[in-house]
């Protein structure tokens, strides 16, 4: 914790960092790989939680409120239409492709997603936030993030893949198999992080 505080103080160029006001920006999107049975619940949960965040009623929002933190949910790729009631609409597409069959999304859309993150950080800075936390919501995200981590670190998929939100042992085996096959089939270029993200 001390190391983090020192880094924040360095970024702010002051001996005692200011971390108020603070905001959490939660990027919400669906993953097509859910079709492979790699999660315990359905894709529709992403939209439900996104809507609840927009109303300030999700568990995350309640925890953030107790810390005096504002929450900005961003629909960057939820598989269904989410009303703009408290949700920032930056939808790039309605969910990604199923990485078991195809790359997750075109390179240009991966770049747009990164640019959206930059836009949200700039928005928060313009509003005067001193600390911005980024987060994600999307059923299947631990599958795609494990795939990205395996490629970028060179670590075995099996050492990076977990049960997510309570996957069974058989489901976990299926999840690892899907990730390993996706990496082998799409051959992401480790020297090009955007290629890794998009595949």
At which residue positions do the language-model features occur?
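N-terminal loops that bind phosphate or other acidic moieties
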Residues: 1-199
């Amino acid at each position: 914790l001390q190391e983090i505080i020192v880094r924040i103080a360095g970024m702010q160029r002051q001996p005692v960092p200011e971390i108020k006001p603070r905001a959490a920006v939660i990027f919400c999107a669906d993953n097509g790989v859910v079709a492979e049975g790699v999660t315990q619940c359905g894709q529709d949960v992403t939209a439900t939680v996104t809507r609840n965040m927009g109303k300030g009623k999700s568990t995350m929002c309640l925890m953030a409120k107790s810390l005096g933190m504002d929450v900005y949910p961003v629909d960057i790729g939820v598989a269904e239409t989410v009303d703009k009631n408290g949700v920032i609409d930056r939808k790039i597409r309605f969910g990604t492709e199923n990485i078991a069959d195809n790359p997750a999304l075109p390179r240009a859309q991966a770049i747009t997603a990164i640019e959206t993150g930059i836009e949200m950080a700039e928005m928060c800075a313009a509003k005067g936030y001193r600390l911005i936390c980024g987060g994600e919501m999307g059923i299947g995200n631990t599958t795609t993030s494990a795939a990205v981590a395996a490629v970028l670190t060179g670590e075995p998929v099996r050492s990076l893949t977990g049960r997510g939100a309570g996957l069974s042992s058989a489901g976990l085996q299926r999840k690892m198999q899907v990730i390993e096959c996706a990496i082998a089939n799409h051959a992401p270029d480790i020297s090009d992080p955007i290629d890794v993200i998009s595949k």
